[in-house]
UniProtKB/Swiss-Prot annotation:
Biased segments, Polar residues type: 14-23
Protein's name according to its UniProt entry: Transcription activator of gluconeogenesis
PAS domain sequence ranges: 408-480
Annotated GO biological process: cellular response to starvation; gluconeogenesis
Segments of the chain annotated as binding DNA: 40-68
Keyword Nucleus: yes
Lineage, highest ranks first: Eukaryota, Fungi, Dikarya, Ascomycota, Saccharomycotina
NCBIfam families the UniProt entry points to: sensory_box (TIGR00229)
S-S pairs: none
Compartmental location: Nucleus
Keyword field: Activator, DNA-binding, Gluconeogenesis, Metal-binding, Nucleus, Transcription, Transcription regulation, Zinc
């Protein structure tokens, strides 16, 4: 039997319990709130309400039925710049039909196709376009830069390209690979009209790229050496000997008119005086380029005007128009133009031993015994360090070293193309690996003449500079780990016999992961006075 207090307590709690139960039932009986309609593009721009049907009443009244489509939903910040087809299906945004830009080339016969549709296709209203060229290999870095580019809008309108084309290879081989992978993909079962249209654009893009004239560089023949390898040049070229495995040094040639007409396909007019070569008397300036007039040809005019302030100007193409010059057959130089090719195609190390052997033979023929002893003494200083660093390296390590060399050289080539300093890159055995156009103009040797055979940097130096070369190499490569050194005077030999270019050379050394010298960059500046 309950006490009165207990009965009172039970009676007082019953109303609260029933109230809580009724409140829970009311929540369950509430209807779900309707989803908010997605506004169309026109209503979203004006920040007004819109209805679900298309076209909406507001667009009908204003005559905008053709453009009444759902406004695209904003992507998350970390997804901006990434193609929708690469996103998981669960996070792909709802987008209206895209405007697709077709790249046009002046040299393509198909450039006049669909001209009437170009005005509509070049309206870059879709967020599927970014305003910069592909400059990063990481999607995250490229996405970040695309956001910054859209904010500051510094790039030109012509640089706007679709992201779908940006992240897909444009050559025929890559297109076939992409097509096969897309057909075999388990995620895509039906091909939408939009994807079909995009595939047609890719095919047109690849066809236009294929119709572009091939770059004449590099030359597959070695006839450029028919007069540059000494008295037996013609016999050496006719024998078709491997100039990469056997060393034949470059030999300057006598020139009666102090010009390089003897090795030009289009010689300069012989009636033109050397003192009037591309000369602007109003500002005391010469205009140089790699095809008509180089710096060695101005030796005599500069001497005549040594008491006056004389300057030179280089004619060069835009860095954006310059292509990365690579050649698979040149193992000592840049072989591939993309990192993917470097890491997948290089499966053997580069042997520096033949280079050192031929370098020693060349030095024995050029210098006397006393000079050879001094050079060998400089080499002997870093020989123990070299052995200690490389004794534990395996075959796989050496393959990795060559991949690092090619990858580093690729980045340096991109950087060198943006500056105007004459630059030459050579390996630790002295074999020239890359030169830019400014270096061609400075010394008179073309890129093919220096890279189409085994060529050492000491071949184009005078005797005194070669002696300083080995002293500097010993200092910068194995004693001083600052990685830079300066040759106050470096005299370069030009193809014209007797013409020497006085320069100041700054060395920059790049090491590999084991501490060995990977490559040496030499920046050469002429000494005019």
């Amino acid at each position: 039997m309950c006490t009165p207090d207990e009965n009172d307590y039970k009676t007082s709690t019953d109303p609260d319990t029933s109230a809580n139960t009724n409140h829970t039932l009311e929540k369950k009986k509430r209807k779900k709130r309707k989803n908010t309609n997605v506004a169309c593009v026109n209503c979203s721009r004006l920040h007004v309400s819109c209805e679900a049907k298309r076209p909406c009443l507001r667009c009908i009244s204003k005559g905008l039925t053709a453009t009444c489509v759902d406004a695209p939903r904003k992507k998350s910040k970390y997804l901006a710049g990434i193609p929708n087809r690469e996103l998981p299906m669960s996070i792909q945004p709802d987008l209206p039909p895209r405007k697709i830009m077709i790249p046009i080339y002046n040299n393509s016969s198909n450039s006049s196709l669909n001209v009437n549709n170009m005005g509509e296709q070049q309206k870059f209203t879709s967020p599927q376009h970014i305003v910069h060229k592909a400059k990063f290999l990481s999607n995250a870095a490229d996405s970040e830069y695309s956001i910054l580019s859209n904010i500051i809008y510094q790039d030109t309108l012509s640089n706007k390209i679709p992201i779908d084309i940006l992240y897909s290879n444009t050559n025929s081989t890559s297109n076939s690979t992409i097509g096969n992978s897309s057909n075999n993909s388990p995620m895509v079962t039906n091909t939408s009209p939009e994807e079909t249209e995009m595939e047609k654009i890719r095919q047109l893009y690849s066809e236009q790229r294929a119709n572009m004239p091939p770059h004449p560089y590099p030359s597959s023949n070695q006839n450029v050496y028919s007069i540059l390898l000494g008295p037996n040049s013609a016999k050496i070229v006719a024998s078709q000997v491997n100039l990469f495995a056997n060393h034949f040094p470059l030999v300057p040639v006598d020139s009666a008119d102090n010009s390089l007409n003897f090795k030009r396909l289009l010689p300069r007019d012989p009636s033109e005086k050397s003192s009037q070569i591309n000369w602007d008397s109003s500002i005391n300036q010469y205009y140089l380029n790699s095809e008509t007039v180089t710096f060695p040809e101005l030796a005599i005019p500069l001497k005549r005007r040594k008491n006056h302030l004389v300057s030179v100007s280089l004619e060069s193409c835009s860095p954006d128009a310059a292509n990365i010059k690579s050649n698979v057959g040149w193992e000592h130089s840049l072989r591939y133009s993309t990192p993917m090719e470097i890491y997948t195609s290089i499966n053997a190390p580069f042997s520096h031993t033949p280079g050192f052997h031929h370098l020693l033979v060349y030095l024995k023929h050029r210098f006397n015994q006393q000079d050879l002893v001094k050079m060998c003494r400089s080499i002997a200083e870093f020989r123990p360090i070299f052995i200690a660093c490389s004794v534990t390296l395996t075959e796989e390590d050496m393959i990795f070293m060559e991949q690092c060399y090619q990858r580093t050289l690729l980045e340096y080539v991109k950087f060198i193309a943006q500056i105007g300093t004459p630059t030459c890159i050579w390996r630790r055995n002295g074999q020239i690996s890359y030169v830019n156009e400014e270096f061609e103009i400075l010394c008179g040797w073309t890129r093919e003449e220096l890279l189409n055979k085994m060529t050492f940097i000491v071949e184009i130096m005078d005797d005194e500079s070669v002696r300083d070369y080995f002293k500097t190499l010993s200092k910068v490569a194995y004693r001083d780990f600052r990685g830079s050194e300066k040759m106050k005077v470096c005299r370069l030999l030009s193809p014209i016999k007797g013409k020497i270019i006085h320069c100041c050379c700054m060395w920059t050394l790049k090491r590999d992961v084991s501490g060995l010298p990977l490559m040496i960059l030499g920046n050469f500046m002429p000494i005019l006075n």
